[in-house]
């Protein structure tokens, strides 16, 4: 028998007494990634929500937080950060496909909500820092760690002006 997910919450008392309740769940969710970054394996995802009764449904309002890592899009060094995404979703029985989440047998499962929020918030092109200089496109040196002697490529559209400058220098 599979172990019970910590993201499964019994909401019978919330529905019966119509009293809101705060839930904080910290657990691992495997395979959270997009093309540019991921939640490191073994890392905890924090789901902090207020569960509010709405008749026979439950509204979850709060945040989802998780660490992330991925290669910097400019220098390829590993970049790290923490994402935080807002959530405001409804759980009901029967659920409306794509609109609400299922509430079944007086239980809700926060994992699909957390998974969707994290995947939407993960950076697709991470930066190690805002002012990252990146790699030199000619020699490949990391310009955050040193400089190179490569000259920037000349724009061919300005070549006529370069010729004028050369002509002026020769005449003097």
Q: Where are these predicted regions, by residue range?
A:
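Structured interface patches
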Residues: 1-172
């Amino acid at each position: 028998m599979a172990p019970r997910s910590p993201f499964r919450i019994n909401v019978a008392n919330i529905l019966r007494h119509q009293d809101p309740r705060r839930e904080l769940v910290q657990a691992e969710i495997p395979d959270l990634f997009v093309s540019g970054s991921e939640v490191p394996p073994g890392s905890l995802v924090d789901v902090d929500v207020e569960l509010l009764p709405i008749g026979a449904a439950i509204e979850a309002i709060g945040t989802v937080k998780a660490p992330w890592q991925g290669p910097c899009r400019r220098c390829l060094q590993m970049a790290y950060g923490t994402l935080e995404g807002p959530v405001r979703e409804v759980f009901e029985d029967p659920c409306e496909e794509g609109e609400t989440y299922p509430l079944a047998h007086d239980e809700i499962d926060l994992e699909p909500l957390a998974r969707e929020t994290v995947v939407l918030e993960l950076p697709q092109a991470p930066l190690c820092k805002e002012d990252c200089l990146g790699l030199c496109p000619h020699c490949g040196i990391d310009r955050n760690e040193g400089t190179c002697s490569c000259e920037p490529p000349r724009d061919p559209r300005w070549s006529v002006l370069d010729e004028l400058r050369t002509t002026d220098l020769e005449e003097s």
